[in-house]
Structures are given as C-alpha cells and as structure tokens.
Amino acid sequence: MLRLQDIIRVQVELTTRCNSRCPFCMRNYRGSDYNSGYPVTELSLTQFQQIFDHQLLDQIRWQPPQGSFPHRMTQFYGVVFNGNLGDFCNARDGVEIVRWLVDQGIEVKINTNGGARTAQWWAQLAHPRVQIGFALDGLADTHGLHRQDVDWHRVIENARAYIQAGGRALWRFCPFDHNRHQEQQCRDLAASLGFEGFENIWDGRDRGPVYTRDGEFSHWIGNLGPSESADPPPLQALLDNHVTWYDRGTVKLEGDVADPEIRCVHKMNRELYVAADGTVYPCCYLGFYPRTMHHPGNDRVRELIQPNNALVQPLEQCLAWFDQVEQAWQAQSVAQGRPYACVKHCFRKPQT
C-alpha cells in the first residue's frame, strides 16, 4: 500500500450528521431511525488543521506540470468532502474549513444534498478553487422519493445563490425507475441555471422498500418484478436479516474467486479517507467505523486495523496498517479473511 509521501488527494467525511434519510444510506435503515454503531460527531476547524499539516498540504496542492498552460486543471481536487454517513452542509465549521483550504492553494470538491442552510451561507462558498456537486435526483415531484426530508426547491435556491455568487456547480443525478424520464429536463434546467456540468451517479443501490422514521412502510423504489408482492415484509424482519446475513456465511460476490485482480482505488488514485472522528483509512469503502459499526465489510477490517486516529498520533503512523489490507487479499475467500469491501468494490473482471 501507499505511504504518506505518495498521497495526492484526501476524501473527508467532515461530519456524520445529515438532514436527509436516503433509504440506501448506512446511517439509517431504509429510511427508518437506526444507528448500527457509528458516532455522531464532526471535525472542527482546529482538528482539521491538525490533520492537514504543511507536508500533506504540499502534496495535495496541484502544481501545473512544467511547460503546461498556466490555467487550473479543473478535474484535480486535493480535498473531496464526500462522507459515508454525513453531509457537508451539516458541519459547523464547513465554510471556515473551505476558506482555509483555498487560502492554502488547495482545490476543493464538495458533494452534498444541498438541502440545509440558507442561500447566503452557500454563497459564501463560491470560489474558483471550489466545485460543489448538488445531489438532485429528478424534479420537485420525484426528488424526495430518494432524498427524503430534502426540499427540492430549497436545493435549487441554494444552488442558484452559490452560482450567482460566482460558484462552480455540478448537478449530480441518481437515475431510478421513477425519475429516468426526467433526466433531459434536469439537464436542460441545469444548463439554464448555470451549472457547469451534469453527472449521472450509479452505485447499484436502486431498489427496495422505503420506511418512515418510525418504521412504517412508505413506498417502493424500483419497479417490482412480475412475481414480487407490493406488500413489503415488516421492517424488523428486514433489519434482522440485514444484521445477520454476513454472520451466516452466505456472502456471495462475483470477485470472490481464487487470485482475484484487485484494482485498489487507494493505490490508483493515491488517496486517503479521513472519517469524522479523525480515523484514517485507505478509502471510503473501508471507513465505515469498523471498530463499532455493524457493517458487512467491517469484520475483517476490524481485525487488521491498528491505531489510526490522526488526532491522537502522527498521520504517517495512521497508515502503517494499510499493508495488512493488501496482504489479506491473498486469503482464499471472504469467508477465510479476504476483505469483503475490497472484493465488492475493487474486483476487476477478467477481459474476455
């Protein structure tokens, strides 16, 4: 695995707090209130500055190659705010942290639901070194089916204020069966509002029942198959199965074969992931609070992890255990110790 001097980008989960209840997010269960062991916390400006010392800042600051055109390379970001559980707009020191980073010459990318704070707050983030990706999954009548508790009109208002202040915005669209027919309308609206780009986000989580905070069935996401019932099972039955399926040894992954080719995002992108409690991981896929959170990918990581809190020990020491993750790829299967997340997210299919 990589050493600190190899790192050129850091993904940061600034907070585990969120104003939304996306049904496929690990911070709840299908929209219902459920915490499987993550801390409710965030990084302050002082703590952030402690982690991002001068050495790390020098490494993630983009320098144009010698002889290149002197304009900014817009696709390189030294810091990406894109947490597993929380949303940037819920962090108390978010604006101050971004201002500090751009003052250090760092390119910043923020991915957010954009549904909290005022328009004036968002306008403060406008800067040539900052791009904000607003998650807008359709129009006003469909957006909230996935981004629960997020008001589409408010997101548009916040994005418009940010753009009018000179901000660079990206429309991030998750396609579902219920909103695919609106994609072109969304593209047209994005262009008319001044978004500089439109991006389709696909992560495979696009189907299942959705529940209220109190566990009552709300609606389905995704079209039902011909043999499927529109009546969902009780939430508790789904939750019990979710909690125990990994423990039953029934994990089946396409890449769980002998000698899999793992294309590690940590190594390819030369990046780290810093969670909201200051702990450090090779990537976001391994950063679901493995010491405390019940998650399919955490059991093996929990065994490998060593002291990794950058608020307690030097950042370089926090990377020392990464080599053990790579060594664990040599296990014969997930059941025998190969990290689940590495196989699920970084397995490369053989070329046919």
Predicted feature locations:
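Radical SAM enzyme [4Fe-4S]-AdoMet core and its adjacent flexible, acidic
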Residues: 13, 28, 32-49, 58-65, ...
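Catalytic phosphate/metal-binding cores of nucleic-acid and nucleotide-processing enzymes, i.e., regions
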Residues: 78, 110, 133
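Cysteine/selenocysteine-centered motifs that mediate thiol-based redox chemistry or coordinate metal-sulfur cofactors
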Residues: 310-352
